[in-house]
Amino acid sequence: MDLALLHPDFVRTARRVSRPLAQAMDAVGPPDWPSRHQQPLARYLARVVVGQQLSTRAASTIWGRVEALGKAEQQSIPALALNLPDATLLACGLSAGKLKTLKALAEADAAGVLKRQRLARLEPAARAIELTALRGIGPWTADMLALFYFRDPDIWPLGDLAVRKTLERFLVTQSRYDLSSAAALFAPHRSVLALYM
């Protein structure tokens, strides 16, 4: 999907929602949409879980320790959660809850639940149901996976506070649109709207 080609249409649609939104989109230009699917899905999910509810700096530090441990022990992530002592992983800065989630991801990966090709064929809603059945994976994580790993074109992550707050800022008080109805104007490319936010 060429975001540069979509950009003028997005600005026009944004103008229907609010002039400040259109001006902001026009000023920033087409967003980047980084692809994360080069790495194994289980590893990507592990990285997301490790970073949840932490500052970027803390998440990066802890993930760096986990990566270094995996390299030193010649263990893949998250499989190392099943193969190394809990104390070793907790010493990296992981919480007990995140360690349990990494173990669940490793088990799911070993069972074939996290096969990228299989999950990619599912509709995003069906995929989200499967993923949120895993320990520690909630709707926000499923949405981020749909956006950045699978690059589904029409994901509107209502659970993402930054996305919601940014769009709310542009909805003027007299606007006839609320968050959902404003986002609906951008279907079937609401993922791109989320990237602008």
Question: What are the functions of these language-model segments?
Answer:
Residues 1-35, 100, 120, 124-125, ...:
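C-terminal accessory module of base-excision DNA glycosylases/AP lyases that mediates lesion recognition
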Residues 8-12, 22-23, 54-133, 185-187:
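Alpha-helical ds-nucleic-acid-binding substructure associated with the helix-hairpin-helix region
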Residues 34-39, 53-55:
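Short secondary-structure boundary/capping segments within folded domains
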Residues 38-43, 81-82:
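Short, flexible turn/loop "capping" segments at secondary-structure junctions
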Residues 46:
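Phosphate-handling catalytic interfaces
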